[in-house]
Amino acid sequence: MNQLLREVLTPDAERTQNFTVGDTVKVHYKIVESGKERVQIYEGVVISVANEANGKTFTVRRVSYDVGVERIFPLFSPRIAKIELIRKGKVRRAKLYYLRNLAGKAARIKELKGGKALVSEDRKRQQAAAATKSTTTE
């Protein structure tokens, strides 16, 4: 059974995890409502990455109207259109659950030195992957 799952859920080059805990990401998530499909963008800080291989999930937290909202996404879900890296965070923990108890400026995460270069490098890689994907489908 695991071998079958591995074959079905083989990670794409664009779907490999290019973010870690503490990074700010935009998750483009497909939502189907009454037969229509639309993409919803969810932006926030990755506070945890769980599991391994094909069952890997990550939790994204954001504050919306002074209320903390957390959402767990499966990394290899077909409903995720793309994951965009916004900024790299400098953290020293594997799980950032302590952010739940912090508010305002205390809940900010410092940006990693050289993080902007990593983000621009990641965007170029995603654009190249999208370009090769569009040329192969035509």
Curated annotation (Swiss-Prot):
It comes from the Bacteria. Gene3D superfamilies: 2.30.30.790. Belongs to the bacterial ribosomal protein bL19 family. Keywords: Ribonucleoprotein, Ribosomal protein. InterPro entries: Ribosomal_bL19, Ribosomal_bL19_CS, Ribosomal_bL19_sf, Translation_prot_SH3-like_sf. One of its GO terms (cellular component) is cytosolic large ribosomal subunit. This is Large ribosomal subunit protein bL19. The keyword Nucleotide-binding does not apply. The gene is rplS. It comes from Leptospira interrogans serogroup Icterohaemorrhagiae serovar Lai (strain 56601). NCBIfam families: rplS_bact. Coiled coil: none annotated. This protein is located at the 30S-50S ribosomal subunit interface and may play a role in the structure and function of the aminoacyl-tRNA binding site.
